[in-house]
């Protein structure tokens, strides 16, 4: 399961 949370940067 892959969850992309806002804040990758």
UniProtKB/Swiss-Prot annotation:
GO terms for cellular component: extracellular region. One of its GO terms (molecular function) is hormone activity. The modification Glycine amide is found at residue 9. GO terms for biological process: neuropeptide signaling pathway. It is found in: Secreted. The modification Pyrrolidone carboxylic acid is found at residue 1. Keywords: Amidation, Hormone, Neuropeptide, Pyrrolidone carboxylic acid, Secreted. Hypertrehalosaemic factors are neuropeptides that elevate the level of trehalose in the hemolymph (trehalose is the major carbohydrate in the hemolymph of insects). Belongs to the AKH/HRTH/RPCH family. This is Hypertrehalosaemic factor.
């Amino acid at each position: 399961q892959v969850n992309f949370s806002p804040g990758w940067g």
